[in-house]
């Protein structure tokens, strides 16, 4: 009996990152972020080898990554954290998953109780 040689179709995966919250405050540049992703995404073990496999687009406050190659949300989170650390924003902004393949950059919540405790210590 002949082996099954049918190939699986390439699945196109779309990941979206909503960067509206930090962009409105003027601390985040979506164009710079999308350029960073283009420059640092690895395809087949090589940086800058996007070709037709991965497309990064920026539309206002939404950055979209469309991939027909292997690309995970964890890798996008890793690259985003590296970008935030490089631009010294990691202490104020975090990368949060909203739904499957949809992410958002939000500010850390500072509770008023923490601020009161700091004032009491002094």
UniProtKB/Swiss-Prot annotation:
Biological process according to GO: cytoplasmic translation
Entry keyword set: Cytoplasm, Ribonucleoprotein, Ribosomal protein
Pfam families xref list: Ribosomal_L22e (PF01776)
UniProt keyword Ribosomal protein present: yes
GO cellular component terms given for this protein: cytosol; cytosolic large ribosomal subunit
Family recorded in the similarity comment: Belongs to the eukaryotic ribosomal protein eL22 family.
Extra facts: Present with 74700 molecules/cell in log phase SD medium. There are 2 genes for eL22 in yeast.
Oligomeric form and interacting partners: Component of the large ribosomal subunit (LSU). Mature yeast ribosomes consist of a small (40S) and a large (60S) subunit. The 40S small subunit contains 1 molecule of ribosomal RNA (18S rRNA) and 33 different proteins (encoded by 57 genes). The large 60S subunit contains 3 rRNA molecules (25S, 5.8S and 5S rRNA) and 46 different proteins (encoded by 81 genes).
Name under which the protein is recorded: Large ribosomal subunit protein eL22B
Organism: Saccharomyces cerevisiae (strain ATCC 204508 / S288c)
Gene that encodes the chain: RPL22B
């Amino acid at each position: 009996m002949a082996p099954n040689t049918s190939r699986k179709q390439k699945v196109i995966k779309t990941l979206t990152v909503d960067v509206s919250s930090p962009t409105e405050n003027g601390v985040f540049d979506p164009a710079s972020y999308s350029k960073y992703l283009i420059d640092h995404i690895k395809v087949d073990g090589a940086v800058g080898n996007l070709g037709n496999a991965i497309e990064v687009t920026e539309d206002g406050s939404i950055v979209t990554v469309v991939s027909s190659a292997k690309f995970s949300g964890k890798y996008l989170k890793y690259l985003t954290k590296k970008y935030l650390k490089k631009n010294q924003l990691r202490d104020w902004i975090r990368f949060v998953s909203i739904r499957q393949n949809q992410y958002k950059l939000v500010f850390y919540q500072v509770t008023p109780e923490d601020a009161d405790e700091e004032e009491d210590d002094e």
